[in-house]
């Protein structure tokens, strides 16, 4: 009975003062976000990440993101690009599981070319416009390429430097 009385008072007040009571539709203007993980899969990770903590961390992060406006991708590299996924929606459980399986299948081997991995990730991020972009590098160190390879450490480091400058210009 008390609730009905309060409800009637509210209705009467709304009728007496209609200009004071109104509803406004609030539109959320969240900026979409693309996150790309650049994952070092070189042989040194076998000893420096024995428990595969870096990969587990990325998988755990994937589990925590369920928003439609956040897209996640990755680039797995050593001295070549091993696998990648351009940023994509993981709002559905199936999408999250598929991405986690891809990341879980990554193996550690060979040498390290950080410039190559970051450059590839930068290309994947640059493709999408009107999106906030975030790049996360997971590595145990520096570029490590043996002498006599067609690509030198200096070339890799120059490419890395160029990518960092591009990322700064693009707000990544």
Residues covered by each model-derived region:
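VWA/integrin I-like adhesion module and closely mimicked acidic/polar interface patches used
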Residues: 105, 116, 123, 134, ...
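Von Willebrand factor
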Residues: 27-89, 114-121, 134-139
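Sec-dependent signal peptide cleavage junction
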Residues: 17-29
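Positively charged n-region of N-terminal signal peptides that target proteins for export
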Residues: 1-5
């Amino acid at each position: 009975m008390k609730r009905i009385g309060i409800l009637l008072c509210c209705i009467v007040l709304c009728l007496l003062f209609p200009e004071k009571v109104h509803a406004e539709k609030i539109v959320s203007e969240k900026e979409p976000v693309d996150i790309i993980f650049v994952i070092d899969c070189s042989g040194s990770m076998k000893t420096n990440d024995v428990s595969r903590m870096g990969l587990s961390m990325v998988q755990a992060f994937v589990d925590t993101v369920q928003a439609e406006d956040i897209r996640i991708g990755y680039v797995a590299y050593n001295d070549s690009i091993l696998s990648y996924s351009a940023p994509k929606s993981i709002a559905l459980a199936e999408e999250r599981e598929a991405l986690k399986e891809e990341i879980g299948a990554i193996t550690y081997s060979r040498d390290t070319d950080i410039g190559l991995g970051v450059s590839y990730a930068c290309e994947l991020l640059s493709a999408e416009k009107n999106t906030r972009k975030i790049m996360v590098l997971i590595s145990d160190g520096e570029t490590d390429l043996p002498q006599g390879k067609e690509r030198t450490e200096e070339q890799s480091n120059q490419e890395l430097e160029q990518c960092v400058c591009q990322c700064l210009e693009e707000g990544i």
